[in-house]
Amino acid sequence: MPDTARDRLADARVYLCTDARRRQGDLAEFLDAALAGGVDIVQLRDKGMEAAEELEHLQVFADACRRHGKLLAVNDRADVAHAVDSDVLHLGQGDLPVPAARAILGADVLIGRSTHAEAEAEAAAVQEGVDYFCTGPCWPTPTKPGRHAPGLDLVRHTAALGTDRPWFAIGGIDLGNLDEVLEAGARRVVVVRAITEADDPKAAAEEFAKRLRHA
């Protein structure tokens, strides 16, 4: 098994973003199922949550990731990432600049970027301090209402860059359209509803992991 966070990132195929499941009340059980099924990285994305509440939920994420040897990602906030000792900080285009985040977190925390256009993907593929990036949305998604979906053309462009830096396709990806994403050249994906809304999250994660690792 890969033994460092950077090794685990290189080996990662399935990146899950989920809310804190306050409505369902099953966060710990859900995370155990998804991580056991094959999710490699998990990120809490629950906009509007106060920092204290976010830290409380992230402790559940951190405990689950330790149990399963998987990576914990924090969205947007370097201070929160530092407080919970996360493995990963993910930054959008409008978030904290990468050098500032790196100054706060040091060299060991992995930093990812969101990209939504060819120029952004090209920059993220070479920018100093960036460890991985996400490219999309492949399809419109309710988790990002109003955001233009550049579609699979952006995935194809990113694949054509030939970068050794890990990158993930994102946006509306499910088991029904995964083959299209693979055909466009992606070998890693970010998943939300296809696992969070699955009747059997572990089985859904297993299927994603199997198909991505055999691609």
UniProtKB/Swiss-Prot annotation:
A single cellular component GO annotation: cytoplasm
GO molecular function terms noted in the UniProt entry: magnesium ion binding; thiamine-phosphate diphosphorylase activity
Cofactor(s) listed: Mg(2+)
Binding annotation for 4-amino-2-methyl-5-(diphosphooxymethyl)pyrimidine: Q43, L44, R45, D46, K47, N75, S114, K144
Alphabetical list of InterPro entries matching this protein: Aldolase_TIM, ThiamineP_synth_sf, ThiamineP_synth_TenI, TMP_synthase
Bilayer-spanning residue ranges: none
Family: Belongs to the thiamine-phosphate synthase family.
The protein's name: Thiamine-phosphate synthase
Highest taxon, organism lineage: Bacteria
Binding site for Mg(2+): D76, D95
UniProt cross-references to HAMAP family, sorted A to Z: TMP_synthase
This protein's record includes keyword Metal-binding: yes
Protein function: Condenses 4-methyl-5-(beta-hydroxyethyl)thiazole monophosphate (THZ-P) and 2-methyl-4-amino-5-hydroxymethyl pyrimidine pyrophosphate (HMP-PP) to form thiamine monophosphate (TMP).
NCBIfam families hit by this protein: thiE
Enzyme Commission no: 2.5.1.3
Catalysed reaction equations from the record: 2-[(2R,5Z)-2-carboxy-4-methylthiazol-5(2H)-ylidene]ethyl phosphate + 4-amino-2-methyl-5-(diphosphooxymethyl)pyrimidine + 2 H(+) = thiamine phosphate + CO2 + diphosphate; 2-(2-carboxy-4-methylthiazol-5-yl)ethyl phosphate + 4-amino-2-methyl-5-(diphosphooxymethyl)pyrimidine + 2 H(+) = thiamine phosphate + CO2 + diphosphate; 4-methyl-5-(2-phosphooxyethyl)-thiazole + 4-amino-2-methyl-5-(diphosphooxymethyl)pyrimidine + H(+) = thiamine phosphate + diphosphate
SUPFAM superfamilies found in the cross-reference section: Thiamin phosphate synthase
Any Pfam family the entry gives: TMP-TENI
Keyword set includes Metal-binding: yes
Entry note: cofactor: Binds 1 Mg(2+) ion per subunit.
Pathway: Cofactor biosynthesis; thiamine diphosphate biosynthesis; thiamine phosphate from 4-amino-2-methyl-5-diphosphomethylpyrimidine and 4-methyl-5-(2-phosphoethyl)-thiazole: step 1/1
Organism: Streptomyces avermitilis (strain ATCC 31267 / DSM 46492 / JCM 5070 / NBRC 14893 / NCIMB 12804 / NRRL 8165 / MA-4680)
CDD domains: TMP_TenI
GO biological process: one example: thiamine biosynthetic process
Keyword field: Magnesium, Metal-binding, Thiamine biosynthesis, Transferase
Annotated positions binding 2-[(2R,5Z)-2-carboxy-4-methylthiazol-5(2H)-ylidene]ethyl phosphate: T141, P142, T143, G172
